[in-house]
């Protein structure tokens, strides 16, 4: 059976973007990054209105948009707010992703969906699950260098994810310590196995 729908999971800084790039360029998969879908939600006026109902004013700009630095800090420091936001954003993102998966199946396309926050329902939609991991110091360095987080912020964000509990759901675990050729070779092995 052809495995056309791939779930690419792993924690922040694990190198999922590199894997997605290779799947797109080398193996001709269409790709979706669920965090980008989430960011689109944060631009939606109705969604922002729902957030304004319970978030403090300090996380919003004067024009009503989110002040992302303040928003991120709040979510890192307050798990109650983080969980409330997640209960709003996650269903929207999963619904959009599910629609794209069904469309890809109808069209006979190949689709790789990346997320750092999987759940069992999402994983059940995929034909195969690829877990991307990297050593903690590398993950922290990537988040500091590429996204501008402090080391403390990076560590807190990584630790808040609890992604490792999904490692056992994976059909393949890919080590991504930074050598792109090794990652490409590992992806070739994965694609051949599925």
Model-predicted regions and their roles:
Residues 6-8:
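Hydrophobic anchor at the beta1->P-loop junction of P-loop NTPases
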Residues 14:
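ATP-binding Walker
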Residues 17:
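Walker A/P-loop
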Residues 29-43:
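Short beta-strand-centered segment that lines the nucleotide-binding/catalytic pocket of NTP-utilizing
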Residues 40-107:
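ATP-dependent small-molecule kinase phosphotransfer cores
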Residues 98-106, 110-146:
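ATP-dependent NMP and nucleoside kinases share a basic, alpha-helical "lid"
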Residues 124-125, 145-194:
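Small-molecule kinase domains that catalyze NTP-dependent phosphoryl transfer to phosphate-bearing small molecules
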């Amino acid at each position: 059976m052809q495995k056309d729908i791939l779930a690419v999971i792993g924690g922040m800084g694990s190198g999922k973007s590199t894997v997605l790039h290779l799947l797109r360029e080398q193996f001709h998969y269409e790709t979706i990054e669920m965090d980008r879908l989430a960011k689109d939600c944060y631009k939606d006026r109705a969604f922002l209105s729902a957030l304004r109902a319970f978030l403090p004013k300090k996380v919003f700009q004067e024009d009503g948009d989110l002040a992302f630095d303040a928003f991120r800090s709040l979510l890192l420091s307050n798990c109650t707010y983080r969980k409330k936001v997640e209960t709003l954003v996650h269903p929207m993102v999963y619904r959009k992703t599910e629609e794209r998966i069904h469309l890809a199946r109808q069209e006979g396309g190949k689709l790789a969906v990346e997320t750092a926050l999987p759940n069992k329902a999402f994983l059940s939609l995929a034909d195969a699950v690829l877990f991307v991991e990297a050593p903690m110091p590398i993950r922290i360095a990537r988040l500091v260098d590429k996204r501008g987080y402090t080391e403390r912020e990076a560590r807190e964000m990584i630790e808040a994810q609890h992604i490792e509990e999904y490692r056992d759901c994976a059909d393949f675990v890919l080590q991504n310590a930074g050598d792109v050729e090794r990652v490409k070779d590992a992806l070739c092995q994965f694609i051949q196995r599925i």
